[in-house]
Amino acid sequence: MNTTDSSLLADIREVNLSYLLLAQRMLRQDHAASMFRLGFSTEVADILMRLSPAQLVKLASSSSVLCRFRFDDYGLLSALTQDVLGGALQQAHATILLAKQPVEEIA
């Protein structure tokens, strides 16, 4: 494995660990709101809450990025990037559009 690949894997691991730690912290502070914000099912949220620090590090060491870009629909992404609604209304619109997306579950 070359230096670029090693650096990329280290960056992925860092992003994954940051994401997992943030998700756990969010879930501890406000479980229901965090499940909505993260797009987690109850089962996924419960599993994540039970993970030990060692398990988080092991999971973060995956070569795949664990968080998912939720704006995978072109129409949705373009609608949210247009500055036609303004601040608070734009944020409310984004929340409504995200709420319509199904929660992903670990298969």
UniProtKB/Swiss-Prot annotation:
Molecular function per GO: DNA binding
GO biological process: bacterial-type flagellum assembly; positive regulation of DNA-templated transcription; regulation of bacterial-type flagellum assembly
Keyword Transcription regulation: yes
Any matching Pfam family: FlhD
Endpoints of the signal sequence: none
Subunit structure: Homodimer; disulfide-linked. Forms a heterohexamer composed of two FlhC and four FlhD subunits. Each FlhC binds a FlhD dimer, forming a heterotrimer, and a hexamer assembles by dimerization of two heterotrimers.
The protein's role, per its UniProt record: Functions in complex with FlhC as a master transcriptional regulator that regulates transcription of several flagellar and non-flagellar operons by binding to their promoter region. Activates expression of class 2 flagellar genes, including fliA, which is a flagellum-specific sigma factor that turns on the class 3 genes. Also regulates genes whose products function in a variety of physiological pathways.
This protein's domain notes: The C-terminal region contains a putative helix-turn-helix (HTH) motif, suggesting that this region may bind DNA.
Name the record gives this protein: Flagellar transcriptional regulator FlhD
Organism field: Bordetella avium (strain 197N)
